[in-house]
Amino acid sequence: MKTERVTLCNRLGLHARAASKLVSTAAEFQSSVNVVRDDRRVNAKSIMGVLMLAAPVGTELEIECEGPDEDEALAALVALVNDRFGEGE
């Protein structure tokens, strides 16, 4: 299993559009992908789970990937967060 911590730096945090991008990116990979906030772990391929994290700007999340393409999945998700979900803010 590969993990990496990221900090949400886009202005609105993990709102609906950002959550949708995260879920669709996670779904591109065979590996299981989880996102952890504090003690809450959710499936990153579940829009409801991701939205339930209610993560505002500045929140630190841990992304966990396990499976045959875990390296690629983790790299893609970390890049998405670091790119502010393409929002340019």
Positions of predicted regions on the chain:
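Compact, glycine-rich, soluble single-domain proteins
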Residues: 7-57, 64, 88
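C-terminal structural segments of small proteins and small subunits
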Residues: 54-89
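Extreme N-terminal starter segment of soluble prokaryotic enzymes
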Residues: 2-3
